[in-house]
Amino acid sequence: MSNETKCPFSHAAGGGTTNRDWWPNQLRLDLLSQHSSKSNPLGGDFNYAKAFKSLDFAAVKKDLAALMTDSQDWWPADFGHYGPLFIRMAWHSAGTYRIGDGRGGAGRGQQRFAPLNSWPDNASLDKARRLLWPIKQKYGQKISWADLMILAGNVALETMGFKTFGFGGGREDTWEPDADVSWGKEKTWLGGDLRYGKGAAGKDEGVVVADEALHGTETSRTDSGRNLENPLAAVQMGLIYVNPEGPDGNPDPLAAAHDIRESFGRMAMDDEETVALIAGGHAFGKTHGAGPADNIGPEPEGADLERQGLGWASTFGTGKGADTITSGLEVTWSNTPTKWGNSYLENLFGHEWELTKSPAGANQWVAKDAAETIPHAYDPAKKLRPTMLTTDLSLRFDPAYEKISRRFLEHPDQLADAFARAWFKLIHRDMGPRARYLGPEVPAEELLWQDPIPAVDHPLVNEQDVAALKQKILASGLPVSQLVQTAWASASTFRGSDKRGGANGARIRLAPQKDWAANEPEQLAKVLKVLEGIQAEFNGAQSGGKKISLADLIVLAGGAGIEQAAQKAGHRVTVPFTPGRMDASQEQTDVQSVGALEPIADGFRNFLKGKYNIRAEDLLIDKAQLLTLTAPEMTVLIGGLRVLNVHTGQDAHGVFTDRPETLSNDFFRNLLDMRTEWKPLSEARDVFEGRDAKTGAKKWTGTRVDLVFGSNSQLRALCEVYASEDGQEKFVRDFVAAWAKVMNLDRFDVA
């Protein structure tokens, strides 16, 4: 009997019930292996920075400028100019950034992939990217999609008469969706029921139209009772920022202002930057709501195969041009929608406004008794009355926003400068330091939000200096644990998401880092005082201007401690050290912005700032992912830091060794010892006690972070490698390599 003819075949690779179906709370170790070389078609040897430097930048800009007015029949340009569409594409690419965890943003070209390519707020941007394809095809790998989408937005502004602040390339494409970014827990588009205590239940249509049956007729919420879950910055699932109709579709400008301030603030924008972005962005283009939402087909990820990745097919009229349905709103703000000017603010303050409905049924506003002065996007003989969104009226009726908006109305030059700077910040916020910027249009001005660090202006230490400094450090009386902990505290602020933080700059000695609970301020101050003394003595004895920065000395001290600990375990190692870090000043440090880097948890130091509804082991994965660590690197660092007695606070949880400050594999050997029985010390199950299975004698205490390395099957398999009889040497070698990686994560100057 043929199995092929008699037995149904319904299980392709990856099909069937998965481990996460059985165990939904399984540890997300997969987050530590995303964006690997196996998903990258360019290979490990491809150097994007080198490729970008060979790009004919002027030619790309010329081609982009020509595209702006080259309207295509398959997707015509509003007002004969694609500029507003490309501004929206660039804005929505960058606008997913949130300062809380640094995730989102334009830096990886993620708008090409799910879920972003199918968010309701990104409707029709699939067409924008297809319009760009001939240019991307022409220049190939010399410019990434991530850079091209942002550059297209810049060129769009320039072709409509606006002078931009500059452009820095260097955004390297990824080839699969980011799995580490939480966009919220809602299961329906436009839902907000889980990110707020009370919010919209959501819906599935790909347009932002209020649905009274779902949203209700909720009254205004203008106080702080509307609390958005951290680190989210968008108010509803599938939106970039806020609902343009108002909170959950409620057309209340003051309630909307609360959402705007919260959302833009979480994207690192203050009130002036927020007003500038809205007023500047809405100087151009229009929204699209020509007909009811039920004319719209599935988003790109849900569309049929023959649609070839395009979504939101419309059966309304021609489905394009004047018949386009995108947001469900039908608003044109400016009298000159393809030319920079102040018409947006002039209209906003020059008319009184009454609530109306778009053809799609969305709440919007129309100027009372106003003349028809707004051009039609496709009929030059037709004029329209000025229209606004609820969120536009927020700029007039919120007292703080109104003050700024009126100043911009009276001083258009101030708006132009503020918008140029805010736009530049928006599209570069996740790129990290200026050292990463590429191309001929990088502005010379240094901006505070870029976390500036002085350029090296003196000769650096050589090998002999390094050896002498190590001796001084080890003779200072500072214990190995404190040397290592201080270096870790300095370097582990790095976030691979937005490339911020790290040891360079030595901001650990400045506010706010010097006062963070994770850094044990009293102990930190003592360590820094000793290291500053060594630094001053060394620098004072040099001729020719040679110096060592405190940033370098902190890292060197950690390495010296590790070398001594390895020697105690019988291994001679040299921890790699590359000088060249510099010390930032307090004036170069935005305290509020840097405050976003403060760890609420650092499993590598067994630190939890408070009690959270997220498991400590999940917070460890989050931290490891931000540090760009693999699962083996995370594992070996935990084992090494524990035996080096690195921990925050007095409780030596996880120090599974009777010879602390010796770089041994004791953590792994003792964790996997079957002669130890573990029991939780409280109902919270956050701290555990390990006792001898025979005698009952207390041996160790450990946290959830410690015990997960023996509990989780994958982590236990990694621990077994290092706990084996032949694992000690590999452990030391791998620990030193992982340590050096963390110490150098922010060294873009030597990468």
Curated annotation (Swiss-Prot):
Binds 1 heme b (iron(II)-protoporphyrin IX) group per dimer. InterPro entries: Catalase_peroxidase, Haem_peroxidase, Haem_peroxidase_sf, Peroxidases_AS, Peroxidases_heam-ligand_BS. Keywords: Heme, Hydrogen peroxide, Iron, Metal-binding, Oxidoreductase, Peroxidase, Signal. There is a cross-link at Y241-M267 (Tryptophyl-tyrosyl-methioninium (Tyr-Met) (with W-91)). Bifunctional enzyme with both catalase and broad-spectrum peroxidase activity. Homodimer or homotetramer. Its EC number is 1.11.1.21. The keyword Oxidoreductase applies. It catalyses: H2O2 + AH2 = A + 2 H2O; 2 H2O2 = O2 + 2 H2O. The record marks R88 as: Transition state stabilizer. Residues 1-12 form the signal peptide. GO terms for molecular function: catalase activity; heme binding; metal ion binding. Pfam families: peroxidase (PF00141). Formation of the three residue Trp-Tyr-Met cross-link is important for the catalase, but not the peroxidase activity of the enzyme. PANTHER family: CATALASE-PEROXIDASE, HYDROPEROXIDASE I, BIFUNCTIONAL CATALASE-PEROXIDASE. The keyword Iron-sulfur does not apply. There is a cross-link at W91-Y241 (Tryptophyl-tyrosyl-methioninium (Trp-Tyr) (with M-267)). The lineage of its organism: Bacteria, Pseudomonadati, Pseudomonadota, Betaproteobacteria, Burkholderiales. GO terms for cellular component: cytosol. Its cofactor is heme b. This is Catalase-peroxidase.
